[in-house]
Regions:
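ATP-binding pocket architecture of kinase catalytic cores
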Residues: 5-119, 124
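Catalytic-loop Lys-Pro-X-Asn motif of eukaryotic-like protein kinases
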Residues: 178-180, 184
C-alpha cells in the first residue's frame, strides 16, 4: 500500500516475520532526499521506541527496509492517543542532535513565507480543470483567505512580516505528523510513521 508518492510493500521472510520495503520517488522527479531524511530521522528517534526500526537502505536504488509493525489504523482518537503524540513531540526536542538538522520540507519561519506557500498551493489547485473546485477556490476560499490575511496583517507585530523565527525557537518536526500516519498496536501503544519531511519548523505550524 502506498502512502503519498512512495510505494510500500510487505515482504514475508517466513510465516511469523515480515519487513517493510519502501520505494521512494525518483530523485529526478522529486529532488528532496526523502529516503535519507527518513532513515536519519528514524535512527535519531529510535531510542524513544515509538517508530519502526531501520533494517537496511540503499542510496543508489533509493529504497529502504524497515521493521514491520503489527497493528491497525487509528479509527477513534482517545485522550491517551493524544498524550502519546504530545509526549513524542516533546521528547524529540530533548535529543542532542537537534540543532544539526536542516529545515523540514516546506517549513515556514515567517508570515511572508507562510503566505507565499499558501498562494503557491492555491495556484496549483487552480490549474486543475474542475468547475466545482475552481468555483470553490475563486468564490469561497479566496475571499475568505483575503479577509483572514488582511486581519492577520493588521494584528501582526509591525515591521515583522518578513522576520524569520530564530533557530532557538524552532522545533524538530516530523512535518506530516498525525494519527493518519500512526499504527495502533494491540497493546494500545502508537507507532508513528512517515518521516520523509522531518526537520526544523515553526512549533505553531
Amino acid at each position: 500500500k502506498g502512502r503519498g508518492n512512495s510505494r510500500i510493500y510487505k515482504l514475508s521472510i517466513n510465516k511469523n516475520n515480515s519487513i517493510l520495503l519502501k520505494d521512494y520517488p525518483d530523485l529526478l522527479v522529486d529532488s528532496r532526499p526523502r529516503m535519507q531524511t527518513e532513515v536519519n530521522a528514524l535512527k535519531l528517534v529510535e531510542d524513544l521506541r515509538k517508530t519502526p526500526k531501520v533494517v537496511a537502505f540503499d542510496k543508489l536504488q533509493n529504497i529502504a527496509l524497515y521493521e514491520w509493525i503489527k497493528g491497525e489504523s487509528v479509527y477513534r482518537i482517545e485522550d491517551y492517543h493524544i498524550e502519546q503524540a504530545v509526549n513524542f513531540i516533546e521528547n524529540i526536542q530533548n535529543l542532542k542532535e537537534k540543532d544539526s538538522w536542516s529545515q523540514a520540507s516546506e517549513a515556514c519561519f515567517s508570515a511572508q513565507q507562510l503566505i507565499k506557500q499558501i498562494n503557491s498551493r492555491f495556484d496549483k489547485l487552480l490549474m486543475i480543470k474542475n468547475k466545482n473546485l475552481n468555483d470553490f477556490l475563486i468564490y469561497t476560499f479566496k475571499p475568505l483567505f483575503n479577509k483572514v490575511w488582511e486581519s492577520s496583517e493588521k494584528n501582526w507585530p509591525s515591521n515583522n512580516l518578513e522576520k524569520e523565527l530564530p533557530k532557538s525557537m524552532q522545533i524538530l518536526s516530523p512535518s506530516d505528523f498525525g494519527f493518519h500516519n500512526a499504527i495502533l498496536k494491540e497493546s494500545g501503544d502508537l507507532v508513528f510513521l512517515d518521516f520523509e519531511y522531518f526537520g526544523r519548523d515553526d512549533p505553531v505550524k
